[in-house]
Amino acid sequence: MPRFISFEGIDGAGKTTLAKKVYEVLKKKGYNVILTQEPFTREITELIKKAGWNDPVLLTLLFSADRAFHIKWIMEQKPEIVLMDRYFHSTIAYQSVLGLDEKWIEEVNSKFPKPDIVFLLDIKVNEAIKRIRKDDQFNFEEKIATLEAVRKKYLELARKYNFIVLDAMSKIEELTEKTVQIICSLVKCS
């Protein structure tokens, strides 16, 4: 079974950037490592975007179906280490703030491998918005309250599941070094 490492945080926290940097370092060290992102299948992503669905039950089930394909694909690759840019904790954080029962979301996702380490990149919403504005991804005013609630939920999940909380405002080089050190303590890097 590969080691599962997930990167979580609100939009704009820097998950993708950090995951890519860590991937590059581990690859250079000679590890059979893959970097993936959720949602995984293009079809699910497009379906959700086109329909504009905001129903938390439907979204949870779609993300979980996508995750089943994702995990199957990962296992076929036979990696030593899997770096995941979002995993089921994202579903818990985002869908529970829309009113869905957290325990039900956990149950729906209970058959998926648990991550060995979860890194939560914590950032204040106003700082995340500044980063997102650069990419011009969405209407900010609509998202601020949601991101505040999701950040709060992520911090609750961090306490509940013992995530490693990283200050997303730190320099990327520092975050990369710290993250690689933690992963190496788990996989005994050479």
UniProtKB/Swiss-Prot annotation:
Binding site for ATP: G9, I10, D11, G12, A13, G14, K15, T16
Source species, domain of life: Archaea
Classification via CDD domains: TMPK (cd01672)
E.C. code: 2.7.4.9
Keyword ATP-binding included in the entry's annotation: yes
Catalytic activity, as annotated: dTMP + ATP = dTDP + ADP
Coiled-coil segments: none
Keyword Lipid metabolism included in the entry's annotation: no
Any one Gene Ontology cellular component term annotated for this protein: cytoplasm
Keyword entries, A-Z: ATP-binding, Kinase, Nucleotide biosynthesis, Nucleotide-binding, Transferase
Gene Ontology molecular function: ATP binding; dTMP kinase activity
Alphabetical list of Pfam families matching this protein: Thymidylate_kin (PF02223)
One record GO biological process: dUDP biosynthetic process
NCBIfam families linked: DTMP_kinase (TIGR00041)
Listed PANTHER family: THYMIDYLATE KINASE, UMP-CMP KINASE 2, MITOCHONDRIAL
Protein name: Probable thymidylate kinase
Organism: Sulfurisphaera tokodaii (strain DSM 16993 / JCM 10545 / NBRC 100140 / 7)
Taxonomic lineage: Archaea, Thermoproteota, Thermoprotei, Sulfolobales, Sulfolobaceae
GN (gene name): tmk1
